[in-house]
């Protein structure tokens, strides 16, 4: 895969200061795209956006996706050809603490963005709304969910993303049925990779424990998730956005996840982390009594993405973990993060 298509393209990215957004902007900037990002301040300290060397290479607008006037001003100034919507409140456990904020951000934020598209003097040709694997009604099935399964997330985060999907479907059918704007959603699994500093995510928890010389505490070691390296879904997003830009018949709804062999339990994932880290890394089960509900078994069927675009995952879980650990050790040693990002992106795209 190469990103030559994006050279000179005007791309508007919401949520650009987050973990996935920072990696995405590094990919786009490296491809020569004209990137405008709209997002809150980076959500953690430290954060990947500040480490990624993007200052001066893109337009970064700090704003709240709930603020329609500010969002529209940034959107209209950018005059984007392609829109990638990643802005979200992304943490399940945080959604239990503040459900209203979660719904306002994830549902009305999507409405605000699509209103910008609808009312633009020159609308973009390609729009992709990034949701989550958790949009589906989870029946704890042993097989992967397909794109035609019912959308009914349980917790406020998952449910707000189900709502974001429905909002997107409505706007697509109501205002863009003529295909003038190609609109898709991408439902991606759990991502791992270097540069994630969020709370309540397993790999950041692992890295923090290693930095302190502690054992890793794992809340849900037996839960199964479609883990994948962060570059996997980002490459899929860029592929979908490009293909529907060139031919609006590709607009649709796509799962993005790993092969079945890489849908592992969290305990297995942490085992792989410890093996890659070395130095006696170990973990322990710290299951919490009366913890908020989280799905136990979740897999995606990505046949549609594979058959439509010839897409396939590049890195299996052991290699994902090796890349993640290598990045984390570069960061802990004060190394060159932009160079490490570019190295991983180049290796990924060359496979």
Indicate where each model-derived feature is located:
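Flexible, glycine-rich phosphate/dinucleotide-binding loops
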Residues: 43-44, 136, 192, 262, ...
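N-terminal Rossmann-like NAD(P)+-binding domain of SDR-like oxidoreductases, especially those catalyzing
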Residues: 1-188, 348
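Residue-level marker for well-ordered alpha-helical positions
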Residues: 22, 69, 204, 267-268, ...
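Generic structural signal for small/hydrophobic residues in well-ordered secondary structure
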Residues: 6, 16-18, 83, 171, ...
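NAD(P)-dependent short-chain dehydrogenase/reductase
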Residues: 139-144, 148, 156-157, 162-245, ...
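C-terminal substrate-binding subdomain of Rossmann-fold SDR/epimerase-dehydratase oxidoreductases
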Residues: 30-33, 63, 210-351
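Residues in well-ordered alpha-helical elements
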Residues: 68-69, 81, 93, 100, ...
